[in-house]
């Protein structure tokens, strides 16, 4: 039986313990309690806990790894593929559009703490048993090159509420993305999501298979904002052109997180949650040090 690995990274903003955001609902089974006893039920959950490989399974895995490594890509081609990775992903999205990957509708069921729901007093006792699920990870994005913004402007209050207003908002922030984001750190207090009280960043958003399940849920949470980025410009364009994309609550931008010299379209220290879904496994180990 194949072992299903689970790798999730959620970085919570430091210094906000008195005002924690948590979801009001939980996964069907809490982390650590999904024990597979009946092999026929292997597909009932997205993952299983405490799985142990038999000697036969480990031997089979080593055999597969050896077979996979029998033919290696030439070093010069490795360098080329790494250097032009975004180009190849652009070609991929040009061919497949948003039809290749399925929406991750399971994401919020497995990780309800992503959602910005205030903790209710009557739920505190019940939530205490879930403390082992939650982490207070150190902000991995402390090197973001974006100055602290002294004065946040409520840009959305002026432009939301009509299709014309949303178009203007999207246009304004598209200009911000193309000009300020490329030239360097922001020189103005205006930035996407400046009026939000809860902010999520998804790294490696692709065609939006995590973005839109989250964004659809955030529709009833106007104080929340979702940032998403990808180093493939074709992927970002697919997200922006999607019918569910709302510039008043989401900002998609092109970014390579392995390049710590690139600025972000928002200031330091404002993120509550950072998602990297199937991202680290696609990056060369030597480059993960810059994330």
Swiss-Prot record:
Say where the cross-link Glycyl lysine isopeptide (Lys-Gly) (interchain with G-Cter in SUMO) occurs: 80
The chain's transit peptide is found over 1-21
UniProt region (Disordered), positions on chain = 141-187
Might you give the EC number(s) for this enzyme? 2.1.1.-
Query: Could you tell me where the Low complexity compositional bias lies?
Result: 159-168
State the similarity comment: Belongs to the methyltransferase superfamily. METL family.
> What do we know about how this protein assembles, alone or with others?
Interacts with EP300.
Q: What is this protein called?
A: tRNA N(3)-cytidine methyltransferase METTL8, mitochondrial
Source species: Homo sapiens
